[in-house]
Amino acid sequence: MELKKVWAVYFSGTGTTRSTVERIAHVIAGKLDLPVERVDFSVPTVRQREQRFNAADLVVFGTQVIAGRVPNVLLPYLREKIIGGGALVVPVVLFGNRNYDDALVELRNILAADGLHPVAAGAFVGEHSFSRVLGQGRPNEADKALMDEFAAKIARQVRALPAAPEKPVPVRGEDPIRPYYTPRDSAGNPINILKVKPRTEMTRCDGCGLFAEICDMGSINPAD
């Protein structure tokens, strides 16, 4: 196959998925001597636009894991706005050191339905977005070395491909996809984490509006 571009495409609430996807994409691009283009769809305004690829593209496509699955807020964008055009794709998920459950197979299936060809896939541990204790310091240097090795293998694999594969790469997970994981307390009782809300320390807020601008849910009203 003759590839002309590598894409780094991601949803990244705290930056860990971004750094992982960009690292993998740049290693692949370096091995294949190709340029890299980046699409960050973390904010809602970007998710309103179509994103088109073609058969000369290799796309490293990543998202964080929420409750063992692809975040449900992303599903309309992923299913309706991504136009695969026969591109090769590498689904990547980042999870906060519990489990990625069905997130990887779910992302793979969605991207395949969009007209992309999954040739490899990976799940990596990242520091949990709710805590600096869960998955603390991840991805660490050992994780990054695995990312580099993963990317180098992908470069070798796609260089040898005569054409896009008909079947998507096998990945761990159940299909049909299971329901979203339900968090539980130490006694095993279900917890509703939707009640968790951020609290602003008004004495430290200068009203710059940055958090409202970069909020991946678009849920912060700067006028509040």
Which role does the model predict for each range below?
Residues 1-20, 24-43, 49-190:
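FMN-binding flavodoxin-like domain, especially the glycine-rich phosphate-binding loop
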Residues 168-172, 183-207, 212-224:
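Ferredoxin-like iron-sulfur electron-transfer modules
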